[in-house]
Amino acid sequence: MKEKIQLELKAIFQDIHSVLDRYLIPNAQDSESKILYMKLKADFFRYHCEFAEGKEFEEASDNARKIYKECFELAEKILPLYNEVRLGLALNYSVFEYDIMDNKNDAFDMASKIYGDIMKILDDVEKKRASDNLLLIQLIKENINIWSNETDED
């Protein structure tokens, strides 16, 4: 039963990647949309990593990391720090590094940096825009707290 579900998930992920690669990413109307679609693609590779093993895990994790890294670098250049897509990307990328790749220090540093940067500019940010994204900011902060406690225990 487990294998059947995993096969079905892989087929769904392939379909999603196909739609993203064929239609959404190449036809994105702006850079923010392109980053969002790339993030989704990386997210689905991350989901695949949750049950993949061996070579399949290596391929899925390599693809996820490559795409997360590419869109994270692009987002840093063109999206404001408080942008919902950029914050969601930072959250998901850091979770990938922490949970999937077991790069706890890198994940902690990434989350801490973005949280620290957003706290520095929060007063300057248009209040409405910032409040729309407070949940993402709070999730990043919660991960920092959890990861900090886990690191202290090690």
Indicate where each model-derived feature is located:
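Short coil/linker segments at helix-helix boundaries
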Residues: M1-A11, D15-P26, R46-E70
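Amphipathic alpha-helical repeat scaffolds of TPR domains
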Residues: E3, K10, Q14-H17, E32-E53, ...
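Flexible helix-coil transition and linker loops at the boundaries of alpha-helical arrays
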Residues: I12-K34, L74-Y82, I121-K128
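Extended, leucine-rich alpha-helical cores of fungal transcription factors
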Residues: S31-L36, E58, D62
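Acidic, serine/threonine/proline-rich low-complexity intrinsically disordered regions
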Residues: F51-A64, D99-M110, E153-D154
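A contiguous pocket-lining binding segment that forms or flanks enzyme active sites
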Residues: E56-L81, V85-D99
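TPR/TPR-like (Sel1-like) alpha-helical repeat modules
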Residues: N105-L122
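C-terminal accessory extensions/subdomains outside the catalytic/core fold
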Residues: L122-E126, N145-D152
